[in-house]
């Protein structure tokens, strides 16, 4: 089997049976991988930009609030999605309760996104909400980074993805993990030609990583959004880097969609 076939994207899609850590379960139709393995539970309101994407009420990907009308996520989370079935939950760390539910009127994926055949380059999409969300201590936009984090920087990633690479268990509460930025030259030593300039790589080590369900979620440095969870090597948390969308190279796309300049 080629190296490419060992890649996974970090989204939960329908047919996979997911078991909450409190014993509840969700059934999805097909399985792709993405979760936080080896992370810790976030305090309520500590990550106010984090959102949960729902399809017919079921959580399947993460995202980040970037304006009061816009959510950024991974394009592989929303290919051909029926927006009448899509909602965004903001303002809560729980998958079971709290927060606000928002409808979506438009999904815009990057025009250069192709998918797996192009190694998930430009894996970014922006959701336009049906109504403006109210900024509170529990839900607020995060600034978009215009420069990349330095090599070796500690980055914060968060999500509700699977807790263990060998299990379908997912948390009911938001998890977070500190990972380390690495340059693409070093990243290519492991992930090879699949790593492009539009990818940003980070890792923590064996036993700690993003996984199924974390797709589209935020990668943050110094309070700015530097990346979006995109893809990694299977199994999760095997000690190799994961690939994120490099936000500093997505600014033109973002500005076209949201209709305003990103602060430089």
Residue ranges and their predicted role:
Residues 2-264:
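Extracellular "complement/coagulation-type" protease architecture
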């Amino acid at each position: 089997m080629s190296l490419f076939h060992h890649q996974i994207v970090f989204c939960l899609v329908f047919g996979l049976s997911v078991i909450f850590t409190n014993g509840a379960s969700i059934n999805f139709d097909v399985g792709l991988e993405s979760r936080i393995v080896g992370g810790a539970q976030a305090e309520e309101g500590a990550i106010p930009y984090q959102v949960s994407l729902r399809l017919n009420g079921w959580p399947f990907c993460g995202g980040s609030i970037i304006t009061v009308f816009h959510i950024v996520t991974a394009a592989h989370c929303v290919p051909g999605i029926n927006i009448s079935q899509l909602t965004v939950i903001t303002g809560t760390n729980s998958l079971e309760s709290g927060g606000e539910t928002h409808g979506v009127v438009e999904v815009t994926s990057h025009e250069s996104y192709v998918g797996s055949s192009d190694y998930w380059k430009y894996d970014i999409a922006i959701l336009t909400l049906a109504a403006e969300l109210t900024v509170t201590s529990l839900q607020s936009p995060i600034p978009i980074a215009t420069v990349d984090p330095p090599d070796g920087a500690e980055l914060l990633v968060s999500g509700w993805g699977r807790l263990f690479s060998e299990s379908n268990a997912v948390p009911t509460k938001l998890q977070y993990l500190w990972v380390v930025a690495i340059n693409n030259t070093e990243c290519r030593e492991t992930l090879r030609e699949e790593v492009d300039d539009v990818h940003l790589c980070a890792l923590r080590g064996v036993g700690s990583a993003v996984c199924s369900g974390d797709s589209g979620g935020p990668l943050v440095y110094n309070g700015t959004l530097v990346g979006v969870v995109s893809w990694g090597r299977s199994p999760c948390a095997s000690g190799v880097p994961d690939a994120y969308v490099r936000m500093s190279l997505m600014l033109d796309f973002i500005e076209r969609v949201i209709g305003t300049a990103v602060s430089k």
